[in-house]
Amino acid sequence: MSLGKVYLASGWFSPEWMQEVENIKSVFEKHNISYFSPKDENLCDADASDSMQDQIFAGNIKHLHESEWLLCNTRNKDMGTIFEAGYFNCLEKPIVYFCDGLPPGAQFNLMLAASGIKVCRSLSELDDYLDRCTSSGNLITERYQGEIE
C-alpha cells in the first residue's frame, strides 16, 4: 500500500545540505515513496521578480495541499522549511521530522516534537521507520520521547 506523496521540506543552500536532501530522496526511492522536493522544481534567483517569487510561493503552497504528509529536515533551521512545517500543521496532516546529527540526550524543540508523528535522528532511523510504515501501509505515530526545549 502507498503512503501517498510526501513533501520534502529542507534547505539545500550548501553542498552539505544538498547532499543530505539527495540522501533523503534516496531513502524515499528505496521504499517507492512519491515525493515533491521544491529544490527540484522551483528554484528562485536572488534577484527574481515579484511575479516569479509569487509563482514559486504559490506552487509550493499547492504542493503542500496536494501532499499527504511532510518530511521536515530541521538541520540548520532553514526558515522556509520551518514555515512549511507550520503551514502543513495547520492543514492537520502528518509531519515526520528529520534531524540527522542530533546527539543522544540533546533537546528537540517542543513545538516541533508536539506537531510531529515521528522524529528521525539519522538516515538509518528514517529508513527503518519507512520500512515499517510501508509494511503496515500507514504512517506510524511514535511521539518523540527525548528531552525537549
Description of each model-found segment:
Residues M1-E149:
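Conserved catalytic or regulatory cores that recognize and/or transform ribose-phosphate-containing ligands
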